[in-house]
């Protein structure tokens, strides 16, 4: 999987290959279903060499992932990064805890918000920013069952309206 685009430079007469600035590798779709997401934060992630290779090939699952504070640090737990198939016997453990890299002031601010307001810290997506792996964290408040039903019905009605408008425009 390559994330490049070719930009032609007519004046110089050659093509330049630019890597995309942001490449989303995976999103935590359960987070959007189970939480009202409020503020977003960016954190680096400490990975091994085989983990970044598996990440680039898209072999990651964040379905049950969460962030755990421990001794003034943030840890990503239950994120499954599959073993890299070309690594042989030196591969990593797929479900290991991975350290998240943020400034100390940001970590203290996040932990104070989590303690005060009853919010939780949820990993929303993993992406590459200038070829460096990053995790987008979000402060979220848990949804009740009726909130989930409301969002599903709103989404269904919006889809019906879009289909109807599309069908009307198509009939003309």
From Swiss-Prot:
Pfam families: SmpB. Gene3D superfamilies: 2.40.280.10. It comes from the Bacteria. GO terms for biological process: trans-translation. Keywords: Cytoplasm, RNA-binding. The keyword Cytoplasm applies. This is SsrA-binding protein. It comes from Dehalococcoides mccartyi (strain ATCC BAA-2100 / JCM 16839 / KCTC 5957 / BAV1).
């Amino acid at each position: 999987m390559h994330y490049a685009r070719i930009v032609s430079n007519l004046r110089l007469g050659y093509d330049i290959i630019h890597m995309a600035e942001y490449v989303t590798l995976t999103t935590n779709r359960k987070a959007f279903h189970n939480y009202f997401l409020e503020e977003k934060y960016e954190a680096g992630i400490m990975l091994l060499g085989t983990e970044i290779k598996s990440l680039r090939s898209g072999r990651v699952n964040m379905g049950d992932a969460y962030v755990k504070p421990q001794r003034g640090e943030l840890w990503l737990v239950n994120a499954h990064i599959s073993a890299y198939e070309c690594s042989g016997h030196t591969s990593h453990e797929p479900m290991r805890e991975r350290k998240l890299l943020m400034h100390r002031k940001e970590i203290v601010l996040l932990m104070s918000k989590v303690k005060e307001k009853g919010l939780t810290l949820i990993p929303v997506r993993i992406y590459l920013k200038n070829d460096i792996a990053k995790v987008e964290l979000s402060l979220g408040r848990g949804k009740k069952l009726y909130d989930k039903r409301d969002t599903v019905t709103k989404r269904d009605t919006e889809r019906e309206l879009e289909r109807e408008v599309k069908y009307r425009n198509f009939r003309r």
